[in-house]
Amino acid sequence: MKSALAKLGYRSYHMEEAVMNFEKGDLDKWNAYMECRSEMDWQKLFADYDATADLPSAFYYREQMAAFPDAKVILTVRDPEAWWQSTAKLVNLHNTLVEPIKFIPRFGAFQRLFRNCERVVAGGSFDHDHVVARFNAHNAEVKATVPPERLLVFEVKDGWEPLCKFLGAPVPNEPFPHENTGIATVDKMMRLLVLTDLIKLAWPWLAGLAVVLILLLNR
């Protein structure tokens, strides 16, 4: 959905943005809010964005509807089993890639946020039937909560027409982005940020070593 909205001119706030905005404090803000330690300034958090997508913001659609009275809600629906498979892969990726490097500040905060999201999604149990039931219950809740004039129930196979009609946007002259690149995108982003943050952590030590070497060579 993020790719489709981008082609329509919308800049979406995604989990990726929360991680990228670590130095602005986004991960800490989300953790504090999800752990009931502080309120969230939605207007400030999303000041540079036109839309929100993905976790953790998707949990708080009611709060965002209150903060943005003119906002519309797009509920993307898919086969529950396909969603479960995708979610399980994402959890495995996180456990493989992020858990071992949580000593890096950005990834320690991300690991905490991921566990907070996991708690809200799974409700304390990652049992297949339990989690799928919660997924279905969430979709039913959104349909029952959001006024019909503000809600689009959307499947990727529906293509551009219903989405563009709902948003009042022209239909792009290109295929709808059907591919699910979430896992690949997360993997690529994580690896890049790991390298960047490790360099930042190591730089003072490398600089100090360079000074020592220079001093020794000048003796």
Residue ranges with predicted function:
Residues 37, 41-44, 53-56, 130-138:
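Soluble or luminal CAZymes and related metallo-dependent hydrolases
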Residues 1-42, 47:
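PAPS-dependent sulfotransferase catalytic core
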Residues 194-219:
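Terminal signal-anchor or tail-anchor transmembrane helices
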Residues 16, 53-57, 77-78, 156:
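Short His-Asn-centered micro-motif
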Residues 64-89, 163:
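Conserved phosphate-donor/acceptor-positioning beta-strand/loop module used by diverse small-molecule
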Residues 161-197:
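Juxtamembrane amphipathic/hinge helix adjacent to a transmembrane helix
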Residues 1-5, 65, 86-88, 154-171:
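PAPS/PAP-binding and catalytic site of the sulfotransferase fold
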Residues 85-150, 154:
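PAPS-dependent sulfotransferase catalytic domain
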